């Protein structure tokens, strides 16, 4: 039995199990800065965003993501951003702090190019003493493990044409592993590449449709795609649906109050074989928009 438990732990901490180092976001279009530094200061006003995602409610050790981002818009072509992200899954926890810089320039009357870089510090920790073992006094699992905050870089580019955009990014470039702790030498980070695209157009007076897609490319894993369609009424009320390929369906609602307070909520249900063991996912987003400087 003891060897079986050790085997399960080793499998759980293999690279295949934790290849998703970076968390999933359903409402990525409302906070694209978490995925690409090219969006730092891109909006017409500065903003602060808080997001909280609780995945697979009812499953012990299910992923939980908390994030805070800030975007500073300036009068020149520069933009700045900051972020704090914490992602938990079982005994694993990832924490990161990041600072972004982006440069925005007009290539023509309707085309804008943005390029951004991110400097971040990332910590990965493993809570071994919280695991339930047959032998509670086993010294191999008597303490927590942390990598400490390690430096990293990220990049992103964005091309906009009127109300349409396409963006490519790699938020974390450097790859680290846990093998110096002799827990599992095969554990290591995988590269995450993101492709985002979206547009918006008016379908009738006061109603705009906003389709978008986000594609994640991770080596040695299937490509993941989020497809979203949101209807915005009077630039205040949002209704949307989303689909993650072979994984989940979601619905969302959002409201903008006094042109500066935005609250969004997304509800997801699994549609894959996971539906037998997982329940729903909730995602909440709060955003404050600063007044535009005259």
Question: Which role does the model predict for each range below?
Answer:
Residues 1-2, 21:
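N-terminal hydrophobic targeting signals that begin at the initiator methionine
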Residues 4-14:
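Sec-dependent N-terminal signal peptides
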Residues 15-19:
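Sec/Tat signal peptide C-region and signal peptidase I cleavage site
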Residues 20-294:
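Subset of outer-membrane beta-barrel
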